[in-house]
Curated annotation (Swiss-Prot):
Task of the protein: Binds together with bS18 to 16S ribosomal RNA.
Protein name: Small ribosomal subunit protein bS6
Domain of life: Bacteria
A GO term, aspect molecular function: small ribosomal subunit rRNA binding
UniProt keywords, alphabetically: Ribonucleoprotein, Ribosomal protein, RNA-binding, rRNA-binding
Length: 113
């Protein structure tokens, strides 16, 4: 099983319910294919550096998960088919990136407490 991180941007005109529904759809897809969710973060509505689909902002979300590599093809196809997704990027994490992500999560947890 490989370790991956996906960041995706949802259309800013969506309601809070639609955003939660969309995030849940992708999370359910991963878990149904045997993925283990390591971390899930909602970064909220953020202004983008440049316009995408004539929009200046979007709802950012991050998933960190472990899954067999062949599942990613179907996962990314789901992103491409969903009109609510403006952009997405999936990267494979090496051991250094995994340790950095763990430190970042610990730091976020400490600031929230």
């Amino acid at each position: 099983m490989n370790h991956y991180e996906t960041v995706f941007i949802l259309n800013p005109v969506l309601s809070e319910t639609q955003v939660k529904e969309t995030v849940s759809k992708f999370e359910d897809y991963l878990t149904s294919k045997g993925a283990t969710m390591v971390s899930k973060e909602d970064w909220g509505l953020k202004k983008m550096a440049y316009e995408i689909q004539n929009k200046k902002s979007g709802f950012y979300h991050l998933f960190e998960f472990t899954v067999p590599g062949e599942v990613l093809i179907g996962f990314e196809t789901e992103f491409r088919r969903d009109e609510r997704v403006m952009r997405f990027l999936t990267v494979s994490l090496d051991k250094h990136a995994i340790s950095w992500a763990e430190r970042r999560r610990a730091k976020l947890k400490a600031t929230k407490a």
